[in-house]
């Protein structure tokens, strides 16, 4: 009798994706982040579901409903902080996952990569709308500033902003629709993640060498299931420490003040994971230019496969490209720091230089260096 996992219509999908899947024998821990992102998504959907049971999306009661969750609901504080810090863990895993893809040339699987870029946009949109829901000062002003950026679009801009707001300012209609979208988008993300995996399993995984691993495959289970469990345990340990010891480490104190349209906070800034893009936005004095740069800072990832000029796929054997990659990482960390600083000297000029370097590295310096490396190897 054939094993049920190979014959049952549902089981055989799971079997071919997580059990008998042929995987390269040399993939490192950098390949763990896909499963970690899956775990993060599950944590976010579950904690979010329980929060939604107690949350009210009304401007008069939103802030107090979050307070009620933390004070009166059994383990409500735990659920709330798991959800808030779970988002931070989600983005840490996302950035490392994208960084791995850039370093090892995984973007050559263009369908998988482009679905990934789409996923990144969807997660960013979800996180932004989630940040508005507690209806604190930074929620309100963050929503006002970011949605207002759309008014830079010629001709339709101001109508578009009013259409998103559902009125002439960020108010009850905005909060209600943001809650609705924040609830539905994670399920869209889950579906997209399924498509992401579908395209990945068409080609099989990349590996650190960037060479074909068809000659040397091992089954996903037990080798990579055990390896993934280690990653999951580390993720849960870090998240638990964050939630139990310093739940507000990555948050903004301004969000503990109820939203007040008459009082602007001295420094409006988004959550830490958007600061790099926010710094790029602020570094351009023109509103439309800033918005375009903001969108391009993420959208540029979609053009990475077209900018690949090297004869080798991975950066494993390309020391010059490796140096540039780590300069890019340092540049992004600099942008993240600048995004959280006030708009004054010397932060303005540092932000502008870091923004220019970011685009120069990805669009010009790295492709030219790849050609130079080809030349060195007489390829």
Swiss-Prot record:
Binds 2 heme b groups non-covalently. The keyword NAD does not apply. GO terms for molecular function: metal ion binding; ubiquinol-cytochrome-c reductase activity. A ubiquinone binds at residue 201. It is found in: Mitochondrion inner membrane. Its main location: mitochondrion. Heme b b562 binds at residues 83, 182. It holds the Pfam family Cytochrome_B. It is a multi-pass membrane protein. Heme b b566 binds at residues 97, 196. GO terms for biological process: mitochondrial electron transport, ubiquinol to cytochrome c. Its cofactor is heme b. One of its GO terms (cellular component) is mitochondrial inner membrane. Keywords: Electron transport, Heme, Iron, Membrane, Metal-binding, Mitochondrion, Mitochondrion inner membrane, Respiratory chain, Transmembrane, Transmembrane helix, Transport, Ubiquinone. The chain crosses the membrane at residues 33-53, 77-98, 113-133, 178-198, 226-246, 288-308, 320-340, 347-367. Heme 1 (or BL or b562) is low-potential and absorbs at about 562 nm, and heme 2 (or BH or b566) is high-potential and absorbs at about 566 nm. Belongs to the cytochrome b family. Component of the ubiquinol-cytochrome c reductase complex (complex III or cytochrome b-c1 complex) that is part of the mitochondrial respiratory chain. The b-c1 complex mediates electron transfer from ubiquinol to cytochrome c. Contributes to the generation of a proton gradient across the mitochondrial membrane that is then used for ATP synthesis. The cytochrome bc1 complex contains 11 subunits: 3 respiratory subunits (MT-CYB, CYC1 and UQCRFS1), 2 core proteins (UQCRC1 and UQCRC2) and 6 low-molecular weight proteins (UQCRH/QCR6, UQCRB/QCR7, UQCRQ/QCR8, UQCR10/QCR9, UQCR11/QCR10 and a cleavage product of UQCRFS1). This cytochrome bc1 complex then forms a dimer. This is Cytochrome b. It comes from Blarina carolinensis (Southern short-tailed shrew).
